[in-house]
Amino acid sequence: MQGGGPRGAPIHSPSHGADSGHGLPPAVAPQRRRLTRRPGYMRSTAGSGIGFLSPAVGMPHPSSAGLTGQQSQHSQSKAGQCGLDPGSHCQASLVGKPFLKSSLVPAVASEGHLHPAQRSMRKRPVHFAVHSKNDSRQSERLTGSFKPGDSGFWQELLSSDSFKSLAPSLDAPWNKGSRGLKTVKPLASPALNGPADIASLPGFQDTFTSSFSFIQLSLGAAGERGEAEGCLPSREAEPLHQRPQEMAAEASSSDRPHGDPRHLWTFSLHAAPGLADLAQVTRSSSRQSECGTVSSSSSDTGFSSQDASSAGGRGDQGGGWADAHGWHTLLREWEPMLQDYLLSNRRQLEVTSLILKLQKCQEKVVEDGDYDTAETLRQRLEELEQEKGRLSWALPSQQPALRSFLGYLAAQIQVALHGATQRAGSDDPEAPLEGQLRTTAQDSLPASITRRDWLIREKQRLQKEIEALQARMSALEAKEKRLSQELEEQEVLLRWPGCDLMALVAQMSPGQLQEVSKALGETLTSANQAPFQVEPPETLRSLRERTKSLNLAVRELTAQVCSGEKLCSSLRRRLSDLDTRLPALLEAKMLALSGSCFSTAKELTEEIWALSSEREGLEMFLGRLLALSSRNSRRLGIVKEDHLRCRQDLALQDAAHKTRMKANTVKCMEVLEGQLSSCRCPLLGRVWKADLETCQLLMQSLQLQEAGSSPHAEDEEQVHSTGEAAQTAALAVPRTPHPEEEKSPLQVLQEWDTHSALSPHCAAGPWKEDSHIVSAEVGEKCEAIGVKLLHLEDQLLGAMYSHDEALFQSLQGELQTVKETLQAMILQLQPTKEAGEASASYPTAGAQETEA
């Protein structure tokens, strides 16, 4: 048994004396003193262990092999003090056991089970190392601080044969005494979380096992005291089955490819990924460095139209073409712009579909009488119409940017084709073409710049001559147009200085150059001669503007008619009130006269005269108001007729425009399908596919518009129906929710006649005037109803022509309402004659009663 010294005295075994610089110092930490001062029979053979490295270890220095034991012990004591302080910024030295399979750095547990102190130390760059006790020298190439991005170190580490000895220890689980570490994974990160993890490594503390019960009790009491003072209990070390000679041989054989067999592995606690992940990251970084020349600003995205994909045929086939990678690079650069154009066209299709759906909803809510919802839908439809006006159908190949680039590509193709033709006719067919093309392009660049400057100056001179010489305006304008066109061609060549297509074009064969040149020429020529016309012509736009102005006029006149009818209704209520009060006052006057109350009779007479004067003024004002309302009604009828006629013309012209647009779209689709089936250029194939998908979206939009109502007249139809309802309510049916308004003027006249029968001394003149006013009012209403019937007849003819079943049923309901109104007025006019005869006989009856 070792340790024959006195109890509690520090014992240094011969192994410590061999290399005291690597032994465990007695003053590493206060909580470790109790564990190191055990009796000799309770301590195992002292060997090398695992500890923290000092900052000096992480730096290469020439005198590292010549450290004395005193210096090593001093540095270890400082490292122990730093290791006990969780907040310290120093790094401890790690000196430990020999490089054995059973004493290597274990796998780190998952972060979810770490102690809070360990989590706080996770981001601190603490260095540790594993090295052999028999050699104090350190390898300068492995003592540097490791960073997560230093993939070269991990490649060297992974390629080392000595790392194979780490596998058994990485799979070994820890004892129950290691707190805070629950899950052990193989091949985990070689990073630790702080001093607590280093203190809990297997083999860090002196271990001892015994079968004596009093020794086991002593060990348990020492462990409890260590836990109470903040030190983890000791753990059982795995048996060491390897001799030092075998270890030295294994270490030398594992380090043979790297030079010095005795080296120090230095790690960083920031390294969180596993070794397999680091190898994968290294491989992915190497792949990214190889693909660094490819632009990553855009990505290849597909398009939604399956028909365009199927009709493409050989459009995307880049096989057999020179430098297919270059064409795919161009595709990736232009794909986002093509997708933007297609998204705009798809949005227009969505807006058209939404407009048609909202039209149907608006018709339903108008039929249900929910005018608030109808107004909300009308506003939404106006917003959608504005958005649809901002969007425009256009082929992507005719957009300015893409069209300019295709022109530039066509110019480069022409230059390459010319060079290929010259090369084919020369004596040396093997002469390099790319150098000639680059020289030609470089020589033509200064000439193009000079030509551009001269063209700008010439254009300015010609503009001044145009201002001075009006007589030569036509000739100079023609010359200016030619110069502007040439200037635009030169600008196209100078607009893409950073896009070098010569390297791509130079690798194409003459046949491919001829094919691409022909395809580009057809595309640009068709765009210049017959552009993709989707916008309506000027006549159709002017007709739409006129229809909108008439629609606003219909709204204004309808509002005036409705307000006039409301004012007439309020005047009628006031007249009805006066008609109710006057007979009562007349009766009270008669009672006062019969009772000889002449003063009361005089007051009642004055009040009767005042009310009669007010009634006369109201009747005069009501007559003027009725005349104004009648004129507004006639104007409304005329404007609505013009509006209906404009709508019919607009529908005819719009249908003709859609027919022409549909025919042009079908023709364009046929041309694009033919081009896609014959061209093998990837870029042109993708552009033509985008054009084909745009044409398909336009056809879907036209089909939706044909299935539903016309999108340009949806708001006018709703307002038109609203105006018709208002006019019908104002002219045909006198709707008065007030109980007194339910009385017709004839009924008021009958009540007046009934009350006047009680006062025979009243004159019959006012009743004749009332009868005349009522007759005039009834005549005006009959005239308005006649105009309304004519208007309804025109609308019925239009509904029959357009086969609009909903409008036809609505007009039938309005006609039925007008018929009922006419029948009611006829019934009211029949007792009018009887009332007139009775009013004529009232004075005679009154005179007879007076004589009696």
UniProtKB/Swiss-Prot annotation:
Chain spans, region Required for localization to punctate cytoplasmic foci: 437-594
- Paired cysteines (S-S): none
Region feature Interaction with NDEL1 and PAFAH1B1, mapped onto this chain: 728-852
One GO cellular component term, please give it.
Answer: cell body
Found, by tissue, as follows: Expressed in granule cell precursors within the dentate migratory stream during the first week of postnatal life and in differentiated granule cells of the hippocampus (at protein level). Detected in heart, brain, kidney, and testis. Expressed in dentate gyrus, hippocampus and in the olfactory bulb.
Q: Which InterPro entries match?
A: DISC1
Q: Where is this region: Interaction with MAP1A?
A: 1-294
Q: Segment Interaction with TRAF3IP1: which positions?
A: 295-693
Record keywords: Coiled coil, Cytoplasm, Cytoskeleton, Developmental protein, Microtubule, Mitochondrion, Neurogenesis, Synapse, Ubl conjugation, Wnt signaling pathway
Q: Where is this region: Interaction with PAFAH1B1?
A: 728-852
Biological process (GO) annotations held by this record are: canonical Wnt signaling pathway; cell proliferation in forebrain; cerebral cortex radially oriented cell migration; detection of temperature stimulus involved in sensory perception of pain; microtubule cytoskeleton organization; mitochondrial calcium ion homeostasis; neuron cellular homeostasis; neuron migration
Q: What is its main location?
A: cytoplasm
Mark the transmembrane ranges: none
The keyword Coiled coil belongs to this UniProt entry's keyword annotation: yes
| Compositionally biased residues, Low complexity | 288-311
Indicate, by first and last residue, each region the UniProt record lists as having compositional bias (Polar residues).
65-79
**Renumbered residue ranges of the record's region Disordered:** 1-86, 236-264, 280-320, 706-746, 833-852
What residue spans carry the region label Necessary and sufficient for interaction with PCNT and localization at the centrosome?
443-852
Task: State what this protein does.
Answer: Involved in the regulation of multiple aspects of embryonic and adult neurogenesis. Required for neural progenitor proliferation in the ventrical/subventrical zone during embryonic brain development and in the adult dentate gyrus of the hippocampus. Participates in the Wnt-mediated neural progenitor proliferation as a positive regulator by modulating GSK3B activity and CTNNB1 abundance.
Q: How does it assemble?
A: Interacts with NDEL1. Interacts with CCDC88A (via C-terminus); the interaction is direct. Interacts with GSK3B. Interacts with tubulin alpha, ACTN2, ANKHD1, ATF4, ATF5, CEP63, EIF3S3, MAP1A, NDEL1, PAFAH1B1, RANBP9, SPTBN4, SYNE1 and TRAF3IP1. Interaction with microtubules may be mediated in part by TRAF3IP1. Interacts (via C-terminal) with PCNT. Interacts with CHCHD6. Interacts with CCDC141. Interacts with FBXW7, the substrate-recognition component of a SCF (SKP1-CUL1-F-box protein) E3 ubiquitin-protein ligase complex; the interaction targets DISC1 for proteasomal degradation.
This protein is called: Disrupted in schizophrenia 1 homolog
Species? Mus musculus (Mouse)
